Structures are given as structure tokens and as C-alpha cells.
UniProtKB/Swiss-Prot annotation:
This is Probable RNA 2'-phosphotransferase. The keyword Nucleotide-binding does not apply. It comes from the Bacteria. It comes from Shigella boydii serotype 18 (strain CDC 3083-94 / BS512). Belongs to the KptA/TPT1 family. One of its GO terms (molecular function) is tRNA 2'-phosphotransferase activity.
Length: 184
């Protein structure tokens, strides 16, 4: 694996998140419905847009991402963001899965008043993202300010017919979480 510095890896991960989750058109690529982008085209379009991108750099980002944000297709010719999409081009078909009794959502304290009114909503994303453990949820919440971890009564939701999915990186997904299923 080629050597790359931490800043280069972080910048590349942010760039990939932007184009593979939100704005593929920013560099002229098209994602299929499952979110896959042809790697050769991605590299070419990124370079035309002034972003240094190589297969070796992609390999390092995919292999070392602590959150496993990206994955390669089985033939190694395509890459995608595992979850977190806001672009309407993508509708990944996750298999429905029964959740554990509780899941966790990390947020910033400044969002609590709104959450207490409307619950958790996907916003610009396709799904509400939930963590299997409190520590991960706390890290997520800390990205946005003073972290707060909410407990989601996931099994109770599932028993009421609300579906859950789990992305290949372990992130749990659901469409919304009503206030009644949250513990503060």
C-alpha cells in the first residue's frame, strides 16, 4: 500500500464523500441506483476537476477508513459510499434486518429542542443513521458540537412494523424515529 499523509487521506475521504454521496455531477460522474461509480472514470473526472486522485490513494482511503465509508465492487472496478447519500440518483437496496433492543443516535445539544418536537428525521439524507453502541454515537455527536446520545427503542419500533436496515459498515438505518421511541 502506498504511503500517504493523514491530511491527504482526510481530504480525499471528504472529496469522495462529497461526490459519491451528494454531488457526483460536480465532477461529471454518474452513479448507478446502488451508488456505484466506475473507478477509472472517477479518477479521470477528479483529475480534470483539479483533484489529485490515483488508484493507490483510493486503495489506501478504502482500506484505512475507520468508519468504512467506502467499498469496492466484487470485481474491483467500481467504488461507492456505503451509506449517507442525499443524491436522488442513488437508492441502495439494503436488506431489512431486525435491530437490537436499543440503538443510539449522536447529536449536538443545540439540536435537542427540535428533536423533542419532531423526533429524528433524515433531513437531506435518505435515512436516519443510528449506532449500535453509545461510544460511536458520542463520536458522531461530537462532530457537530457538544455531544448528546439519545437511546432509540429499536425493537419496539420494529415490533410496530417500522423497518430497519444495516449498511455493510455496521451503521443502522431507518426512515424516521418518532419522539415516543426516544429516551433522553
Amino acid at each position: 500500500m502506498a504511503k500517504h499523509n493523514e491530511k491527504e487521506l482526510a481530504d480525499t475521504s471528504k472529496f469522495l464523500s462529497f461526490v459519491l454521496r451528494h454531488k457526483p455531477e460536480a465532477i461529471g460522474i454518474v452513479l448507478d441506483r446502488e451508488g456505484w461509480a466506475d473507478i477509472d472514470k472517477l479518477i479521470l473526472c477528479a483529475q480534470k476537476a483539479g483533484k489529485r486522485l490515483t488508484r493507490a490513494l483510493l486503495d489506501t482511503v478504502v482500506a484505512t477508513s475507520d468508519k468504512k465509508r467506502f467499498s469496492y465492487s466484487s470485481d474491483g472496478r467500481c467504488i461507492r459510499a456505503v451509506q449517507g447519500h442525499s443524491t436522488s440518483q442513488v437508492a441502495i437496496s439494503f436488506a431489512e434486518k431486525t435491530p437490537p433492543q436499543f440503538l443510539y443516535h449522536g447529536t449536538a445539544s443545540r439540536f435537542l429542542d427540535e428533536i423533542k418536537k419532531q423526533g429524528l428525521i433524515a433531513g437531506d439524507r435518505h435515512y436516519v443513521h443510528l449506532s449500535a453502541d453509545e461510544a460511536t454515537a458520542r463520536k458522531v455527536g461530537a462532530r457537530h458540537g457538544s455531544p448528546v446520545v439519545l437511546t432509540v427503542k429499536a425493537q419496539e419500533m420494529a415490533k410496530r412494523g417500522i423497518p430497519f436496515w444495516q449498511a455493510e459498515n455496521g451503521v443502522w438505518l431507518t426512515s424516521t424515529v418518532a419522539v415516543e421511541f426516544l429516551e433522553w
